[in-house]
Structures are given as structure tokens and as C-alpha cells.
Amino acid sequence: MNVGVCYADADRQLWLRMEMPDDSTVEQAIRYSGILERFPEIDLSVQKVGIFGKLVKLDAPVKEGDRIEIYRPITADPKTVRRRKIASDDDDDDD
């Protein structure tokens, strides 16, 4: 079956497509893709993974056409980011 594995850091993004056996798991696909060697900062024991934006466990089965995503840790408080965006939008309205 054909699946993809994707990851993005602050500077680059990578989406790898590959053929996997039908009974493969998310973790097997990630390891097989070689993405862990290209991004050594990825720590699967800490970082969350998903399929098409939905969180899944590493032992979740993959299906034909799945896009497996490795998520980076949040580095900013989402509430703070939202407040800054709202404040910025309000400033733009004054023009």
C-alpha cells in the first residue's frame, strides 16, 4: 500500500511517499521512511503523531493513501498567540 510520512521544522518540510506492507503500523512507516535520520530531533517517545490531522498512537494501523504526520511540540502558549493575533487584527482595522 502507498502511504506518506510528513514532518516540518521551522526551516523546511518533507513529505515522503512509500510502499508499505498491508499490515503496517504508523511507527513502522515512520521508521521505514528514513525521516528520523533526516530530522534527528524527532523523538517518537515525546512527539505526537497523526493521520490526516487526527491524533493516533504509534501502533495504529495505516491504510492505503494515509498521510502520517509527526507533530512538533508547541513552543508558544496558544492563548498568548491568539491574544496577540486579535490585538494585531484590531490594530489593522484602525487604518
Swiss-Prot record:
PANTHER family, alphabetized: UPF0125 PROTEIN RATB
Q: Record's family?
A: Belongs to the UPF0125 (RnfH) family.
Q: Which gene encodes it?
A: rnfH
Q: Which organism is it from?
A: Methylococcus capsulatus (strain ATCC 33009 / NCIMB 11132 / Bath)
Task: Quote the Gene3D superfamilies the UniProt record gives.
Answer: RnfH-like
- Name of the featured protein: Protein RnfH
Q: What SUPFAM superfamilies has UniProt attached to this entry?
A: MoaD/ThiS (SSF54285)
What Pfam families would the database entry show?
Ub-RnfH (PF03658)
